[in-house]
Amino acid sequence: MYSGKNPSALRSQQWLADSLIALMADKAYQSISVKEICQNADLTRQTFYQMFSSKEDVIRYTIMKGCETFKASLSLYEQVDMETLATAFFCFFREEAALVKLLAENHLEYLLTEQFSLALPEIMDLCTERKKAFLSNPYLKSFIIGGLLNMILEWIKNGDGADVEELALLFTEQFVKDTPENH
């Protein structure tokens, strides 16, 4: 995946990502070709392969950009505790529900887990010190990401309109009650 700073290349990268997501709204991911993505973005296959190695790479890029947006939203808080983290997470995904639904419909949820797991260390840096120490356990990190993402997927799949704060509180009550700082 391209990671340089060239504005033209970055723009092409975004156009290709937007093209794939737009195509996924009408067609299954598996049946979309690189040629179709390029035609829809009005770019060449050569440009595609300069930016990405595969369609999966395009999805990773899209999710990675979302992770960056999420991290930026967390940096606005003075302190990030577990409830703040969960609330911000659900608020972010409420805005990204259409994308998550497309990923779920195409069995690409594992890419959400993969990319948010990669972003978690930076997200944890925004957490309060006591939580940071607690969250350094790799099993607990997996639990948090898995729990939050599966709640997101269930919420979007059901489309039940559950309130963001209600979901964050539900997660926090289940998770926080057994943390070291509460004993």
Which residues make up each language-model segment?
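Alpha-helical structural segments
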Residues: 15-22, 40, 57-80, 84, ...
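Helical hydrophobic small-molecule/effector-binding pocket
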Residues: 79-124
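Hydrophobic alpha-helical segments that form the core
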Residues: 135-157, 161-177
